[in-house]
Amino acid sequence: MTSCVHLGIVASQSKKMSLAKRFAQLRKASPLFSLRGVYFSAASYDYREKLSRNVLLDLKLDDAVDLFGEMVQSRPLPSIVEFNKLLSAIAKMNKFDLVISLGERMQNLRISYDLYSYNILINCFCRRSQLPLALAVLGKMMKLGYEPDIVTLSSLLNGYCHGKRISEAVALVDQMFVMEYQPNTVTFNTLIHGLFLHNKASEAVALIDRMVARGCQPDLFTYGTVVNGLCKRGDIDLALSLLKKMEKGKIEADVVIYTTIIDALCNYKNVNDALNLFTEMDNKGIRPNVVTYNSLIRCLCNYGRWSDASRLLSDMIERKINPNVVTFSALIDAFVKEGKLVEAEKLYDEMIKRSIDPDIFTYSSLINGFCMHDRLDEAKHMFELMISKDCFPNVVTYNTLIKGFCKAKRVEEGMELFREMSQRGLVGNTVTYNTLIQGLFQAGDCDMAQKIFKKMVSDGVPPDIITYSILLDGLCKYGKLEKALVVFEYLQKSKMEPDIYTYNIMIEGMCKAGKVEDGWDLFCSLSLKGVKPNVIIYTTMISGFCRKGLKEEADALFREMKEDGTLPNSGTYNTLIRARLRDGDKAASAELIKEMRSCGFVGDASTISMVINMLHDGRLEKSYLEMLS
């Protein structure tokens, strides 16, 4: 055993003194020990009292170590049964390394193990994912004449299941039958859980019937494990059929099983089925809990059914099922997204009245709401409030507030938040950088936008196609086409595929810079790249031709567009109408206006402004203005 223990097993006692030091201090300072270490003082005979069931349930780790010290110093030594009680109690604290270390000390003191001791150690090694050492202990105990029992094999089974050796776990259960061990419900439950861990759902479900055939009745935990595993995989129909199977087998499903299926139905967007199952469980007298309600409220909120979600909140309060932070946060987020910030604020106030502390999700949702309604000072106040409550913002919270400031043209405050993120040890993500780059371009700070892009790359944050589109759009709009072309060429050579919007940015940039031929070449190359032009990119190219005075090319592309099945939009018609008006072609512009109106579009602000100016100059009749509106 000693050799097994020394194979890399050292008890982790970072906050505790080593056992050797503890024992040394006990000998030196405590009157519990005689000089010879043989006789206990009158106060220490009662270690047996400390090993009573009630005391062990409340035993603290420090006290357990002290108690072990008392026991090994006691004469005569306590029986192995007494030591087993203590080791078992420590194992239940999940302090497996300590159990192994104490077991090693017992061996050094020549305290012989019994089967129960070996089972404790095997379980600890398995729980530490050290199956080879568990098997070594098994080998040693069998050499000493101890036959493994169902507890031994169940521990090993758990070790196999969690050690990515599921086939050996299945083989072990088969071997148990051969060896005439009778696997119990716990054994099967362990294997079922292991099968789900290794994505063997069908085998796990089949094991239920195999259990029954072997005379072992599945219990609530068995079904709960299978239902949970199936729901995580999205096999909800099978989970529902198991629910019916439970009813036939006179096993009453509990709130946990119903909630698991309801949550899965919600996750897979079957909200009405989830509500029906909720009603079914209620009719059967199974009282829903806060988790059940939270699943449904969250799902209803995601569907924009915030009024139904609010009714569920009222229902749970009436039934004295206390909503928690998850409940309120889901509703607050839904109200914010629906633009109902006043209702969201009322819910927040209700949370505070109920002494429910908001979490980062609550604060982030409200901050987003304030930003959406241009209430940036209140958003900043909420941000500062959450920090004062020791609820520290994450990258998403910062991104929300930075976006709000950038949208309001308060980019410097957004930059200040960006710097604050770094000071807090948070690294901005792609969204952070995209927001700042776009905000800086919109604020006219082209140079700083480029610097932030360079910082993004140097910080190892990967730009995405949105980043490149923002960068290219900004460069083109500020007349830096040459730089944009360099970036675009790099993008084309990279593994990242430009999308239709990226191509549109470049074509528009080329056309506005007077390089219509280059824009046309890029447009023509789209089909070779497998990109189908949409109405936006057609309109951009038509606008480029019109700007250059290439009326025939614009008309030809307009016809091609319709033949291609791409319907013109308001922008397409207005672009062509303005071009015809500039050329003085009243008849052609009138025809286009009629066609546009028949498609349900009207003149945009630019077209109407042009017509009004031409009316004042006497170049157009009033009928044109009436036609447009």
From Swiss-Prot:
Protein origin, superkingdom: Eukaryota
Location within or outside the cell: Plastid, Chloroplast
Keywords carried by this UniProt record: Chloroplast, Plastid, Repeat, Transit peptide
Q: Transit peptide: which residues? A: 1-41
Q: In which ranges do the PPR repeats occur?
A: 79-113, 114-148, 149-183, 184-218, 219-253, 254-288, 289-323, 324-358, 359-393, 394-428, 429-463, 464-498, 499-533, 534-568, 569-603
Which one GO biological process term can you cite for this protein? Answer: mRNA processing
Entry's transmembrane regions: none
Q: List the record's Gene Ontology CC terms alphabetically.
A: chloroplast; mitochondrion
Q: InterPro entries, from UniProt?
A: Pentatricopeptide_rpt, PPR-containing_protein, TPR-like_helical_dom_sf
UniProt-listed PANTHER family: MEMBRANE-ASSOCIATED SALT-INDUCIBLE PROTEIN-LIKE, OS03G0201400 PROTEIN
Family, similarity comment: Belongs to the PPR family. P subfamily.
Q: What is this protein called?
A: Pentatricopeptide repeat-containing protein At1g62930, chloroplastic
Lineage of the organism:
Eukaryota, Viridiplantae, Streptophyta, Embryophyta, Tracheophyta
